[in-house]
Amino acid sequence: MAKTASPGATPPGNGAEPLPDNYETALAELETLVARMEGGALSLEDSLAAYRRGAALVAFCQQQLEKVEQQVRVLDGATLKPAAATDGEDDDL
C-alpha cells in the first residue's frame, strides 16, 4: 500500500524545512538531531527523517565553511600579506 503524507504533518528532514540562517544555528540543530538519534528513542521513520535533515544540515555547514575559507583566501592574498610586510611600524597590532 502506498504511503501518503497527511496534510500538516510534515516530518523534519524531508526538504520542506528551510535551512537555518547561519552556521551556528545549523550546527546546534545538527547536534540536537545527533543526540536524539543516539538516544535510540526515535522510530525508524523518525530516524530516517532526522538523518535526511542532518544530511541537509551537514551540506549547509560545509557550504558555509567553504564560503568562509574562500573569503580568508581573498583576504590572505590581497590584504593580510601586504599589511604584514610593513617596516615594523605597526608591530603592536
Swiss-Prot record:
Top-level taxon: Bacteria
Family: Belongs to the XseB family.
Reported function: Bidirectionally degrades single-stranded DNA into large acid-insoluble oligonucleotides, which are then degraded further into small acid-soluble oligonucleotides.
Region feature Disordered, mapped onto this chain: 1-22
SUPFAM superfamilies xref list: XseB-like
One GO BP: DNA catabolic process
Subunit structure: Heterooligomer composed of large and small subunits.
Gene name as annotated: xseB
Protein name: Exodeoxyribonuclease 7 small subunit
